[in-house]
Amino acid sequence: MTTLQEHTTPNGDILLYSGAPNFKMLDTLAQGAGDVWHSSFEQGLKNTFPQLMYQTAVHWWYLNDFNDVDTAISWRINPEAFVVRKSVWELVGGFDAIYDSKLMSAFAFGINLLRNNGGVPLYVKGLFSDASLISSHIPKLDQYKFFRKHFKATYRPVYRFCN
């Protein structure tokens, strides 16, 4: 279970966060686009979980992370260092508890937010400047659980051993 702290911006927006974000930058970000903000590229998560390319349309442009950008749409959320609007967290239901890995739960949250709920998860360079690198390992069983839950029923027999 992820324990999140609460921050209220000067405009009254209620945000939930994990880690130690730059609050001045965060107050500015909350006035604009985005529902989730993170700095996961610097934390070792850039282009993690490339196996997703085998289960989604190749034209789905959010599959790859871009180089040399300060802000970009990215569903690769670090569960130890991110910020989310409280209303969005409650609407989507937070991280899915079916996964053993917190990282897979965070990725599934980001993909679900972007793909199914019209939300915008944003990578923001420098929002979490003191966050350290994390392991990008996702257990195979969690990968299978993800594919089983999020893709066509015709693929499910392949993943039937995941329960």
Where are these regions (language model features)?
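Short charge-dense sequence patches
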Residues: 32-40, 54-67, 89-98
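A recurrent flexible, glycine/aromatic-enriched loop bordering the glycosyltransferase active site
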Residues: 59-84
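Conserved nucleotide-sugar donor-binding catalytic segment
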Residues: 76-80, 84, 90, 94-101, ...
